[in-house]
């Protein structure tokens, strides 16, 4: 699927650069109470219930998997892309701290991915590919360990939704379930980052030059 031709509205929406009134969301009114796990994020920025999506002619790009209830967060929640990214390395060589937080509890995949992309000492194939998904820079990002834990909790429900919109379900088979997080390993940041198992919810420190799949996410914001 060629994403670059139709995802500018999502970029504008998710980066809060959208200056005119918020787009018509039908089910999603711009308020936290109207956002539900399993809602469909469309290529034009609309967020629909599954029933509304099936009645539309819109194209799905992501499924809402987490709603943020904390007043301390700057977004309403997260949505996961309906396809895997191909296996790529976290870094194209070892020996460089790429500047991620290394936190196992922070919801900071967006910041981590930018650090990977913006590092002048080593290239990050997964960060570069994630940026290439979108027309004008960052919108999608590689989730942190914490954000992947949210996805793990609802993985079966999200897989049903992904299948309904024609996407590729998250692989839960033991040999194919590992996804890169955007989190480096504390004390070994020069050489290792965390893989997350969508089958068991465990994490495994892994050399950063090894290719593995990833599943980009987006944050959901509103201008209201």
Identify the residue ranges that each predicted region occupies.
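Carbohydrate-recognition loop of C-type lectin domains
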Residues: 200-207
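Sec-dependent N-terminal signal peptides
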Residues: 6-14
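Extracellular adhesion/carbohydrate-recognition regions
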Residues: 28-138, 177, 207-224
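An exposed tryptophan-centered "aromatic clamp" motif
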Residues: 123-139, 145-199
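Conserved small/polar residues in nucleotide/adenosyl-binding loops
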Residues: 18-24
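Positively charged n-region of N-terminal signal peptides that target proteins for export
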Residues: 1-5
């Amino acid at each position: 699927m060629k994403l670059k031709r139709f995802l500018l509205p999502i970029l504008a929406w998710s980066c809060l650069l959208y200056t005119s009134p918020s787009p018509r969301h039908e089910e999603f009114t711009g308020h936290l109470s109207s956002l539900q796990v399993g809602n469909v994020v469309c290529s034009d920025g609309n967020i629909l219930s599954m029933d509304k999506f099936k009645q539309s002619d819109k194209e799905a790009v992501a499924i809402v998997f987490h709603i943020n209830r904390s007043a301390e967060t700057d977004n309403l929640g997260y949505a996961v892309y309906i396809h895997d990214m191909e296996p790529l390395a976290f870094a194209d060589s070892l020996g460089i701290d790429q500047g991620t937080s290394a936190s196992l509890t922070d919801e900071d995949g967006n910041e981590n991915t930018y650090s990977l992309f913006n590092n002048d000492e080593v290239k990050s194939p997964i960060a570069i590919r994630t940026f290439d998904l979108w027309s004008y820079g960052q919108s999608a990002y590689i989730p942190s360990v914490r954000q992947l834990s949210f996805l793990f909790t609802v993985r079966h429900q999200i897989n049903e939704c992904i299948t309904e919109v024609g996407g590729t379900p998250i692989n839960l088979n033991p040999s194919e379930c590992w996804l890169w997080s955007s989190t480096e390993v504390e004390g070994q940041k020069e050489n290792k980052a965390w893989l997350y198992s969508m089958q068991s919810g465990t994490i495994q420190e892994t050399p950063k030059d090894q290719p593995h799949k990833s599943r980009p996410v987006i944050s959901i914001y509103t201008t209201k």
